[in-house]
């Protein structure tokens, strides 16, 4: 089993329009009329010169930008990374829309929502990570990242977290082997965890 299998599944899963919509509805169940065509992937390929890549960026109807990271090892630094991802995403949006930042008229940009999906086994993690928690003293800029984890709802995010836990259990049992992958897929399909997705991409996971 590849160590990156959980990241690969996250990336491939939410690049598919039907699962992008399911992800959005897990976060915004009130917006039930949203269509697959309302979404645009804005995941960054590279941020600055540091080689940073973010897991998933979604633009919704030109009014909302969702940045979502998956993390199995908890890190309080995710708020700082999200600041870099958000700056890069806005830079691309401004260039694409040919917006004039030096003009006298207000520039309208999509509002951001920032999330980290925590799939590790640490019991106590904060519900929100803040950039200001990293400051040495007071500061004038803030970034807030909501921490999402297994909540028993069985929505697409909950299923992804469950998939990661099953994958970890099978890797611990069988090591980095094909058997670990096969068992992960078998158990997930039996439990209806990402079953259609895993069945369709079984040879690639």
Residue ranges and their predicted role:
Residues 1-205:
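Elongated, amphipathic alpha-helical interaction scaffolds
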């Amino acid at each position: 089993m590849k160590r990156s299998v959980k990241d690969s599944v996250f990336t491939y899963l939410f690049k598919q329009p039907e699962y992008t919509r399911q992800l959005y509805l897990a976060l915004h169940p009130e917006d039930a009329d949203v269509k697959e065509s309302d979404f645009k992937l804005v995941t960054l390929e590279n941020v600055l010169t540091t080689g940073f890549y973010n897991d998933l960026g979604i633009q919704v109807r030109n009014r909302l930008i969702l940045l979502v990271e998956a993390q199995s090892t908890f890190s309080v630094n995710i708020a700082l990374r999200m600041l870099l991802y958000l700056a890069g995403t806005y830079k691309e949006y401004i260039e694409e829309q040919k917006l004039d930042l030096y003009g006298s008229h207000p520039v309208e940009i999509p509002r951001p929502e920032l999330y980290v999906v925590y799939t590790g086994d640490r019991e106590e993690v904060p519900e929100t990570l803040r950039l200001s928690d990293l400051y040495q003293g007071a500061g004038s800029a803030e970034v807030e990242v909501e921490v999402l984890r297994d909540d028993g709802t069985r929505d697409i995010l909950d299923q992804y977290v469950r998939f990661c836990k099953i994958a970890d259990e099978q890797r611990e049992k069988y090591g980095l082997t094909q058997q670990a992958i096969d068992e992960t897929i078998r158990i997930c399909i039996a439990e209806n965890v990402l079953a259609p997705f895993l069945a369709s991409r079984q040879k690639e996971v």
